[in-house]
Structures are given as structure tokens and as C-alpha cells.
């Protein structure tokens, strides 16, 4: 083979005395004896090169076991000096780069020294000769070895019985000793010791010694296994007899038990205030139960049914508190702000105090995460004196989870509504249906349609669960649902009273942190109020620079972080107290995560700040436009959905129709391409409320007039230049305030909504209502575009279409 130095033949003499030069193959976890044919898998580069070398000469290699199997590149002193000279019978390269080789041991050899060869291990070694010995003694030993080996194989199931037949036919006692040694389950050093012994008599004695020790251990193992097996058989027999005895006892004495059980159920039916239909159903099932064998499967189904029917509350009502002042105190103590919700609850209690026939209201609290929708429901239950049960609808896809499974199915149960009523133990609890906008639907049905019956005040008095098969009155239940968005099926939405919970203002968050989050953090972390304090300025900085959310969930996490670090500091430094101020805040929370009140440094052409409303609150939306030489195409990017792309198209058409008024020569549209991009391309965006921002960006690009950096805007635009109203005004104004922008343009028709905006928000912003695009440009552009005179050419070019770009939803 190429690259082989032909100085000395690789492969030495098998006669004793003279050393031969051999390529060495270090072995891991195996000792190869003479007369053995063994397959080996070789993966190390040096070993593969050694094999390739010997395949090119006379196919002999020295197999020597290394002392540490974990050593990838063993040094000469890490390899045992006694090895086996072997013939390479077959060599096969595998696809993964390793080599499968079949070797046959021929003779023992002793390594005298290793060469300095680096590409593979190479050593001088001499084949070892066996000494002459007493043939009679060896034959006697051999017979004992064969006999013991037969017993060993019988006890050790890992060795094939055919090996015994092969061993008994071997006439060469040296080969017999090596064959037996290779099959013994002994450690590598012990096998190496067997290889190192030249005397056949000593090898046979060692094999005999190892086998006798192993046979005694294997016999003990066999006895243990037999004892365990007998014990298991005895246990199983006892279990079987016990079960038989129980069955016989049931047959003999169950008539008494059965009568007692039936009598108990009958008594429960009498005491429970069931409806007429439910009582008839219960008595009919009881009659069936009387005629059944108590141990039958049908009897178990009937008993479970009656247990469910009698366990749910029938006419058991909590006494609803009607003290309006108490209710107001509870709601105010546990939640700051949320005036509309509190007002609605107090109104309900006031009406209930005058009329007992009023049905429970079905409220739907819609707002971003972390504003307190779920915790508010618990406070309402406390204020009204009702039991509180919660059912999460997130990810519910099966109608049976609402209405239950029919009794024909094995293991059927009532739906979650009836299960929750059983848990409440009263027929008029406050029932929270959490995340109602997260319900899905699939081939098993539409759970939102099943909820129609639950949430309709005129239908839920006769709610029918598939398992119970009788009507159950839910009209006294006070249902409260929560959702992040209004993405709820229309018929379901129509049955609920929507109460929007907008995001909190900075001052509201500050009050919540002082009144609720800080005391909670102190309590949860086993601190004393004097040990841990946070200044008002520090809390305000946490709100501004470490959180950006509509709710207070992230704010709570940051306050908890401060408390944890305070506890750690007190225990480590033995301080008596930790005070967090705006100066040392970054030592505890790290670098600021968000900018507050910092806007881009200069007015730019084609860069407009729009406003977006998402399910997690309001956001600033940067809109960028550029113009380049082209053929009048318009490109839109930024993961925009259809409504937003149509809004850009309408804005472009409006600007083109009024080009002369904006000082733009109409032919410019056919000679230039415009690219409108909304950054953060990974976030899907949709909605029409960025219309006036799109118009401003396009006009700025075409005229070269910069847009003011300190102004934000929101409003839908029409082809006639009118500005239409938008939703989510409070959330958008809060986002404007967070972003440090002082002036905001809103549609004139939204001016009436300003009455519901907190005064501290309105006082910190200059809010300008606008009704037409002209007013928008007057406020937004650094200077007004100058109209020009233009004579229209023949065959005017049509407005180019907007190119499609894919995207997903984000409401504006």
C-alpha cells in the first residue's frame, strides 16, 4: 500500500527467540487468546493505519490489551507486554469510517520494545514457547476442566451450550485452556493473567479455580431466583384464594349489604331537594339497582350516576351579602382603579337588594394580561359572599368537556360545569370562566357553541348535561368570564356584558406597587417592613425602565427580584435593613431594559410614529418610507396583513389624487418606486388605524419634507381624505406617554372618548383631534408642501397596484 516503509517486513517469526517487528493493535475490554477467531470494530486512526499496513504485507499483527480502556491513545507503558500474534482474515470498511476486522490468534508473544513510529503503534516482539510438562497430569486436569465447564455453561445462560461440545472435542490441551478462558465471565486483568501464563498445567488450574468460584456464585443465584419464584407463586396463590373467598362471602352475605346501600341511597333521594324530573330519574335508577347483582358492572354504573346526581347542589344557596358599603370596601382594598367593574358589581347588589327575582349577571372582563381580571373575580365572590369556582377554557376543544359524556361510554363523567358545581357545594356560586377567547374547535365539536346554553340567562335555567340527562338550574350562578381580546364568536359575545379593563397608568401602577405588590413581596420573603423598603422614585424607575406592559405582572416580578436580593444581602452581609433608591436600583436589577421618554434625535423624511393596539396593551409603531428610481411600483414589508396593506393602498391612491396640492408632479409616480416598511418584521400587524400615518409617510417621501419626531398619530383614512375613528384610545395614549412623545393626533370622532381618559394622562399630552388629512399634515410635517400648477397629460398612467406581502394579525 502507498506510504508504507519497506525497511523491515511487518510481521515477525512465530518461533521463539528472535524478535520480529509487528504492527500493534491496542485492544479495549477484550483479551484475544491463541486459536480464537474474533470480530473487532476498530475506530481509532492509528489502529486503522496499523491494520491497513499489515493487510499489505503478510497479514500478521500483534494484539495487545491496554490497561485503561478509556485511554484513546495509550502510551507503550499503558499496554500489557504479553499479547497475541494474529492473522487478519478479513477487513471491511464501514460507512461511518470504522473498520470491522476478523482476526485469528496464532501464538503468544512478548513485547520487548516499541519503535518511535508515530502513525501507528509498532513494537519488537518474540513468540513465546510453551514448556514441556507431564502429559498424564495435564490430561487429568483437562477432564476436570471440561466437566466443570459443562456445569458452568448450564448455570450461565449467556454461553451457548454448543460451546461445551466443541470444547470436549479439543485434543490440544493448550487450545482447550485458551478456549475455556475466553468464555469465562472474569475481569480483563484476570484474563490477561491467563494469557501471560505459558504453562498449560497452570492455565488449566487457573481456569478450574475461576470456574469453581463462579459455579458456587451461580448456584447461589439460582437458589435465590428459585426462592423468589416460589414466593411469588405463593403470593399469587394467596391473592387468588382471597379473591375467591371475597366472592363467596359476597354471594353469602351481600343481600344485607345491598339492602343497606339501597336504603342509604333512598334516604339521600328523600333528603335532597331534587327537581321533579331529577327525582323521577333517581327513583327509576334506584329501582334498576334493586334488581341488579351488586357486583355487576351495570350496578357500578348506576351507583356512580346516582352518586353524581345526589352530590351536586340542588337548591342549596349561599346567603348573598347585600351590604353595598362592605362590597365597595372589599373591592377597593384588593384592587386599585377598575372603577367601571366595581360600579357594575355594586349596581347588581343594589338591584338584588330590592328584587329577589333578578338573574345572575354574565360579565366578560376584556383586557391585557396582568391587569387583574382573574383576581378581581375572586374579590367579587368575597364581596358578594358567594362560593368561588374557576374553570379554565384555554385549549378546550371538545364539547364533551362542557356538557359531559353520555353514560353509554365506559368511564363517562359529567362535564366541567357540573363538576365545578359539585365542588362549589352551593347552587349560586361565582363561576369564573377563564380565557374564554382561547377556546378552540375540532372534529369533536365546538365548545363555544356548548357555552351558549351555559351563558344565556334565558336558557341556563334548563341546562342539560349529557351524563345527568336531567335539567339543572344555572340561573342563580353569577358567571364572570375573562378574555384578552374580543376574538370571541358573535353569538357568545352577544350573551355577555362586556367590561373593558384598559392598561394601568403610571400613577396607578405606582399605587398598586405601594399598596399591594411591595407588602406581598415582604410577606412572601419573610421580611420585616423595617428590613426592606423601596422609595417612590425607585418604584417609578422600575415601572419606566424595567417594565413595558399594560398590566403589573412584570412589575410584580421585578419587585419580587428586589425582595430576593434584599434577603440575600441581609443574610450575607449581616445588614439590618436594605433600602432601594433610584441611585442604587441598577445594582439590584441590572441595566435598564427599556427607554422612557427618549425619542429619535432628529426629524426625518418618511419616518412617522403611528400607534398600535395589541392584546397586551398599546405600542408605538414606526412607519418608514423611501423612494427610489423605478417604474411606479409600491412595495410593502413588515409582516403586514390584508387590512393594513389595503390601508397603505388607499393612502397611496389618496396622495396620488391630491398630488398637485402637495407639490408633487404626477409623472413622478411613474418614475419612482416607493417602499413602505413597518419595522419588527417578526411581529404580525393588521388593522386600518395607521392610515393617516401611511399618508404622512408617503407625502414626506415624495416631497422630501421631514416629519416631526415628537408627534404620534392614529386614525383610519378614506379615499376622500377623511379621518375615521379607531379603538383602544386609552391604550394608545398610554403607549405615547411611555415613549416620551408629547403630541398626539387622534380622529375628531374619538374626542368624546377623552372623557374616560385619566386626567394625569391628558395633562401630560397635547391631544389634537383632526378630521381631515390636511390637518394631519399641518401638524406632522416640519413645513407645509407648496401646491403647484400642472396641466394634465393625455393617457394618464393608472395608479400602480400594491404588491402583496404575507403577514399575520395585529389589531390597531
Curated annotation (Swiss-Prot):
Gene: lon
GO terms of molecular function: ATP binding; ATP hydrolysis activity; ATP-dependent peptidase activity; sequence-specific DNA binding; serine-type endopeptidase activity
Catalytic activity: Hydrolysis of proteins in presence of ATP
SUPFAM superfamilies given in the database record: P-loop containing nucleoside triphosphate hydrolases (SSF52540), PUA domain-like (SSF88697), Ribosomal protein S5 domain 2-like (SSF54211)
Domain Lon proteolytic: 602-783
Role, per record: ATP-dependent serine protease that mediates the selective degradation of mutant and abnormal proteins as well as certain short-lived regulatory proteins. Required for cellular homeostasis and for survival from DNA damage and developmental changes induced by stress. Degrades polypeptides processively to yield small peptide fragments that are 5 to 10 amino acids long. Binds to DNA in a double-stranded, site-specific manner.
Domain annotation Lon N-terminal: ranges: 22-215
Active site: 689, 732
Biological process, per Gene Ontology: cellular response to heat; protein quality control for misfolded or incompletely synthesized proteins
Location of this chain's protein in the cell: Cytoplasm
Taxonomic source organism: Brucella melitensis biotype 1 (strain ATCC 23456 / CCUG 17765 / NCTC 10094 / 16M)
Stretch list, region Disordered: 787-812
GO cellular component, one term: cytoplasm
Family: Belongs to the peptidase S16 family.
Superkingdom of the source species: Bacteria
E.C. number: 3.4.21.53
One Pfam family hit: LON_substr_bdg
Enzyme superclass (EC): hydrolase
Subunit annotation: Homohexamer. Organized in a ring with a central cavity.
Induction, as annotated: By heat shock.
CDD domains, alphabetized: RecA-like_Lon
Residues the entry annotates as binding ATP: 367-374
Protein name: Lon protease
